[in-house]
């Protein structure tokens, strides 16, 4: 009997759950899980996770001390909430969780390093070592340089919002653990730009982008892992079967599980090794030049950072409202 697509995918690719929803992770038993500000904000709104939110706020209030302002308490709780979700997730997966650095620090190398160290220290205080955490950082030049320093300290990074080959090469040269090239957001840009409603999966610009990056890495023997992310349909996923990892939303994991059919391997290191590819070296000037020339990558990186920033601000508002409610309850 033919297996479902998810079972077959797992035979060649590490399947990762792209969600902060703990129940969804329990259902699909992925090896790893990834979160981002939008996913944490969505999970924080779900009734079943209010207890995590409340506990985090109350602990932050206690730790911030008597004279702390509401803003200081919320800021502390906000940092801890992503780790609280991460800790819950690590109880049910065997592998690693990705926790994102504040997107507002994306163009500040020093602040990114400081924040990453703080997140790792929080995990460590809860008994989780750095080998089980990936720190997610946007693939700006400043973010990549921060990650290069963090990797040397034994803090592993997942470089996200990656849309162009120049970003991927800079990450590989910096010795980053893993990258998350986005598929669906690239497709979105091309659909809007061309006015096309759809692309066949094999011609999907996001699929082609990740395929190019994967082949480049394997051709030149880079250790940085490729984890395709941001999928719009299962066709994009099946075209990337064989990628080191793929991080997939619960909805699409369910669709893969419900689909029976053959799944051929599309990405293969042995095939990549035979390709005729030119090697490029990336310094800041080259990165800036290639980034400016790649309008899609330029637009989507900027938009992605703004989107995550908006989600962070929404989460801060949500936490402030929740804190006010908890204080009212406590005063009665």
UniProtKB/Swiss-Prot annotation:
Indicate yes or no for the key word Cytoplasm. Answer: yes
Q: Which residues form the active site?
A: 136
Q: Please give the biological process terms from Gene Ontology that the record holds.
A: carbohydrate metabolic process; pentose-phosphate shunt
What's the main place this protein lives? cytoplasm
- Give the keywords, sorted: Cytoplasm, Pentose shunt, Schiff base, Transferase
Its recorded reaction(s) are: D-sedoheptulose 7-phosphate + D-glyceraldehyde 3-phosphate = D-erythrose 4-phosphate + beta-D-fructose 6-phosphate
**Organism's domain of life?**
Bacteria
Q: Where in the cell is it found?
A: Cytoplasm
Q: Which GO terms describe its molecular function?
A: transaldolase activity
Which EC number(s) are documented for this chain?
2.2.1.2
Could you tell me which InterPro entries the record lists for this protein? Aldolase_TIM (IPR013785), TAL/FSA (IPR001585), Transaldolase_1 (IPR004730), Transaldolase_AS (IPR018225)
The annotated pathway is: Carbohydrate degradation; pentose phosphate pathway; D-glyceraldehyde 3-phosphate and beta-D-fructose 6-phosphate from D-ribose 5-phosphate and D-xylulose 5-phosphate (non-oxidative stage): step 2/3
Task: Extract one GO cellular component term from the record.
Answer: cytoplasm
Q: What class of enzyme is it?
A: transferase
Any keyword Nucleotidyltransferase? Answer: no
- Please give the family membership noted in the entry: Belongs to the transaldolase family. Type 1 subfamily.
Its biological function?
A: Transaldolase is important for the balance of metabolites in the pentose-phosphate pathway.
**What name does this protein carry?**
Transaldolase
Q: Please state the gene responsible for encoding this protein.
A: tal
């Amino acid at each position: 009997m033919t297996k479902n697509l998810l079972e077959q995918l797992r035979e060649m690719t590490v399947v990762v759950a792209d969600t902060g929803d703990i129940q969804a992770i329990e259902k699909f038993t992925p090896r790893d899980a990834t979160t981002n500000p939008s996913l944490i904000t969505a999970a924080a709104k779900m009734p079943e996770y209010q207890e995590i939110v409340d506990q985090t706020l109350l602990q932050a209030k206690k730790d911030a001390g008597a004279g702390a302002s509401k803003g200081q308490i919320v800021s502390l709780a906000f940092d801890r909430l992503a780790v609280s979700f991460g800790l819950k997730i690590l109880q049910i997966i065997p592998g690693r969780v990705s926790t994102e650095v504040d997107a507002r620090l994306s163009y500040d190398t020093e602040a990114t390093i400081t924040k990453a160290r703080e997140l790792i220290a929080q995990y460590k205080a809860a008994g989780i070592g750095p080998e089980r955490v990936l720190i997610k950082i946007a693939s700006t030049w400043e973010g990549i340089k921060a990650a290069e320093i963090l990797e040397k300290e034994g803090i592993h990074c997942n470089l996200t919002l990656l849309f162009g080959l120049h970003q991927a090469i800079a990450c590989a040269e910096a010795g980053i653990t893993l990258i998350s090239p986005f598929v669906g957001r690239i497709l979105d840009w091309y659909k809007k730009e061309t006015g096309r409603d759809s692309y066949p999966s094999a011609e999907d610009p996001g699929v082609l982008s990740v395929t190019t990056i994967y082949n480049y890495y394997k051709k030149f023997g880079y250790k940085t892992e490729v984890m395709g992310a941001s999928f719009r349909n299962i066709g994009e996923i099946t075209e990337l079967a064989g990628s080191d990892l793929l991080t997939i939303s619960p909805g699409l994991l369910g669709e893969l599980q419900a689909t029976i059919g053959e799944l051929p391997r599309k990405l293969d290191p042995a095939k990549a090794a035979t390709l005729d590819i030119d090697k490029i070296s990336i310094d800041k000037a080259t990165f800036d030049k290639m980034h400016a020339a790649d309008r899609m990558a330029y637009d989507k990186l900027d938009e992605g950072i703004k989107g995550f920033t908006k989600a962070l601000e929404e989460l801060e508002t949500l936490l402030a409202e929740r804190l006010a409610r908890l204080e009212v309850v406590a005063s009665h």
